From Swiss-Prot:
Protein name (record): Small ribosomal subunit protein uS19
Keyword Signal in annotation: no
Cited Pfam families: Ribosomal_S19
Tagged with keyword RNA-binding: yes
Lineage: Bacteria, Pseudomonadati, Pseudomonadota, Gammaproteobacteria, Moraxellales
Gene: rpsS
Described purpose of this protein according to its UniProt entry: Protein S19 forms a complex with S13 that binds strongly to the 16S ribosomal RNA.
Length: 91
């Protein structure tokens, strides 16, 4: 279910502080975060945010189409290697 409009978007305070500092200094350095639950705000557009996927940090370049989504949606946590091959059908 979506979050209530009355509550507004959720962004971790430490992440928002890093984003504000990066925007103020016009920094191109990626922002490293573990906060997959934070929502992408219009202030994040154009920044590179490294989102942790459980093993390493995945760089995410934020575009206008990502606003309103969560950071974790763009850093997949599972790798799909395909289903097992049927050996009978090869004959």
């Amino acid at each position: 279910m979506p979050r209530s409009l009355k509550k507004g978007p959720f962004v971790d305070a430490h992440l928002f502080a890093k984003v504000e500092a990066a925007v103020a200094s016009n920094s191109r350095k990626p922002i490293k975060t573990w906060s997959r639950r934070s929502m992408i705000l219009p202030d994040f557009v154009g920044l590179t945010i490294s989102v942790h996927n459980g093993r390493n940090h995945v760089p995410v370049i934020v575009t206008e189409h990502m606003v309103g989504h969560k950071l974790g949606e763009f850093a997949p946590t599972r790798t799909y290697r395909g289903h097992g091959v049927d050996k009978k059908s090869k004959r």
